[in-house]
Amino acid sequence: MKLKNNFYLLTMLMTLLFVVNGCNEDQLDLSNPNAVAEPDFFQNEDDFRLAVNGMFHPITAVLFWGRVIHTGALLRSDAFNIVPFQQNTTMSTLEGQPGIARWSSDMFPQLYQTIFRANTIIEKINEENVPNEAARNEILGQAYFMRAFANWYLVNLWGNVPLVLKTPTTNEELFPFPASPADINAAIISDLNEAVNRLPNSWAEEDSGRPTAGSALALRGKTFLYTKSYANAVNDLRTVTTDFSYQLLPASQYDDNFTTVNENNIESVFELQFLGQANFIWGTDIPGTGTQGHYFIDYSPPNLSPDNGHFINPHILQVFEDNGDTVRRNATIAFDYPGALGYGGVPFTEDFADDIAEAGQLGIPALFTKKYAGFDEGVRDQIPVLGNTIGNNWRIIRYADVLLMLAEALNEDNKPAEAIPFINQVRERAQIAPLALTLDKTQVEQAIINERIMELTGEGHRFFDLVRWDLADDVLGSGSTIAGGRHPKSLAGPTAVFTVGQDELLWIPVPELQANSNLRQNDGY
């Protein structure tokens, strides 16, 4: 493709094919001569390539990465002090409960839609309908990768969820029991094994943005890291650094990783493709109407966001300052430093005057998100409130993240001296001093925590990091004053705190529990 440029026209047919007809045959028995019935589809390579494109859409739609995952999950991190706005922000302030927040029920089925579409492709493709082995491997590799991707977010957001690896053929299979996280992670690894062996190392320009063998290795290595299988994580992540051509962008282009400039670049290991849409309809599964650029309102400043926005907490800025890191600081946090600019190149203090005044009224520092906030899209008055016309790709895994995950896996495998050079590659790009090679395991662990703040804040990793490091209670619990003497969610009040045994996971959506009595609610909800 370039995947984002023609994704939507190509997937229209496949999306309509996957729509379930809710009409009873006794009520309506009319055939649509323009419709494509499933028996008439999946006949050749072109059909399967269309099906692959349709498989991506639930992930990029507004009900998942197009918007909902940001306010529903990623903004729970300690970086963001959320200004409350009705039910829209209760999940990002750690106050969400079934019945008083919207987003969990939106995200959950999107992931299973992608899994269903991947299962259909895997089951229907064969040597007869796609005789070309290379083409068949490309199609299957993408299906296995996206099924693993969807299951990765299911297990890390909800924990005990159904593991659906085939299309249902019996009534019993329509009501699956939850699987253990161990079984889900094993299935993720198995699918990524298939993806690694089938996907190409790179795609032609017209298909840039599709997952590659490097994408699959990186996600498999990440899965091993999260499940504490450190030696396996090292093997996979090191292979990404040795057998592929990924590189860090130079310091002068660091912020290209978060704008519409230079998408699918040499640092991108896997990124979701977005195309700005003029005709937006909330929640639809029709390409061109239900996908937003990255729904930038969740990263825009308070006086530009219709949901009241948020502020960056001062302890995040302090990590940059302690390390002398201005390259990543200036690309991550918008605030009043010499030469700081706002939207469209307007001086920061002029462009952010109302936001700065609001910070003063709230008694907090005037620090704002810069990544994915659309600063390069024009002056503030030209920025669409919903962001649907922007079309900024979201970089799911960057090479810098691979280097830091590799360093972490090596350090956890008691090899701090081997870990440090990989951290220093990331620091060198940021033009800051290298770490001493004599640091011990505990010191390297803290260095990785800090480095991930400087490199990855605002990209959707921090909350997952805090949970897997067992730091979420320390940083977000009721006793935390890490944010300049305040709780990181102080603007939402005293109930906006992390609760151990509950907030590690989201709740299973109530409609899913009502539809399937075999499911059970997560602890604390």
Task: Please report, for each region that a protein language model flagged, where it lies by residue.
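Bacterial N-terminal signal peptides
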Residues: 11-19
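Conserved, well-structured interaction surfaces
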Residues: 44-45, 49-53, 57-63, 84-158, ...
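Acidic, glycine-rich segments characteristic of secretory precursors and extracytoplasmic regions
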Residues: 2, 23-73, 182, 321-324, ...
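Long, intrinsically disordered, low-complexity segments
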Residues: 23-24, 81-82, 111-114, 187, ...
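Flexible, polar/acidic helix-loop-strand segments at domain edges
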Residues: 95, 267, 319-398
